């Protein structure tokens, strides 16, 4: 998981910076034997021990509580071993302070890229004003709202294949929400104008946090 450097600098109490090893992240999730609703077949559990992570893959539900603060970065949730331009329906009770996201998250194999469709977040807008090295690409109107689109290049950073240079693509919902449907294809089509490919690696609907406290109970299909 990568965060813009200016956000990392703002996070009080973070160890080094809230940058997780993406390669370890990719190896941490596990395939599940029986698919849940919507074909869910993937459990994302990166540093779930930083809080209390529980899940029921057959029901498409998970919960995470991090009420003692976060000393590091975690990414936990449910999704698919192979991404697609799918519509993802979710509902949640998501409450977070500090640095946290509720998003659709995944990777593209070639050209390698990491992506977020951020539905809600805690105190820090991941692409807020003043972020260095970030290029705004306009807006996408999708699912009844406007998302601001950004890109960023990560140079010699941890990725799903080790250390590499890759792009990040972000769509951040201008009005936060905690339930609804995300039509990922609308974002992918817009990002494709700027080099986003369609060689999908995993795709999940996780909660992520690298500071503060919070809780999330999420249903995904």
UniProtKB/Swiss-Prot annotation:
The active site is at residues 114, 208. GO terms for biological process: xylan catabolic process. Residues 29-221 form the GH11 domain. Pathway: Glycan degradation; xylan degradation. The keyword Signal applies. Keywords: Carbohydrate metabolism, Glycosidase, Hydrolase, Polysaccharide degradation, Secreted, Signal, Xylan degradation. Endo-1,4-beta-xylanase involved in the hydrolysis of xylan, a major structural heterogeneous polysaccharide found in plant biomass representing the second most abundant polysaccharide in the biosphere, after cellulose. This is Endo-1,4-beta-xylanase A. It comes from Aureobasidium pullulans.
């Amino acid at each position: 998981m990568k965060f813009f450097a200016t956000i990392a600098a703002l996070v009080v109490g973070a160890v080094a910076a809230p940058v997780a090893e993406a390669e370890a992240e990719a190896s941490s999730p596990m395939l599940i034997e029986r698919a849940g609703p919507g074909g869910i077949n993937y459990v994302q559990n990166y540093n779930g021990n930083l809080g209390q992570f529980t899940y029921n893959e057959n029901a498409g539900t998970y919960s995470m509580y991090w009420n003692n603060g976060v000393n590091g970065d975690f990414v936990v949730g449910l999704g698919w071993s192979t991404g697609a331009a799918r519509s993802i329906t979710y509902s949640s009770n998501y409450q977070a302070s500090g640095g946290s996201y509720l998003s659709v998250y995944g990777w593209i194999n070639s050209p390698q890229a990491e992506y977020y469709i951020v539905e809600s977040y805690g105190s820090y807008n991941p692409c807020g004003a003043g972020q260095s090295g970030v290029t705004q690409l306009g807006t996408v109107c999708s699912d009844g709202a406007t998302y601001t689109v950004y890109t960023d290049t990560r140079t010699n950073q941890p990725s799903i294949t080790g250390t590499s240079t890759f792009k990040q693509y972000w769509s951040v919902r201008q009005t936060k929400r905690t339930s609804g449907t995300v039509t990922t294809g609308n974002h992918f089509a817009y990002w494709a104008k700027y080099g986003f490919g369609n060689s999908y690696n995993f795709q999940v609907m996780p909660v992520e946090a690298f500071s503060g406290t919070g809780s999330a109970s999420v249903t995904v299909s």
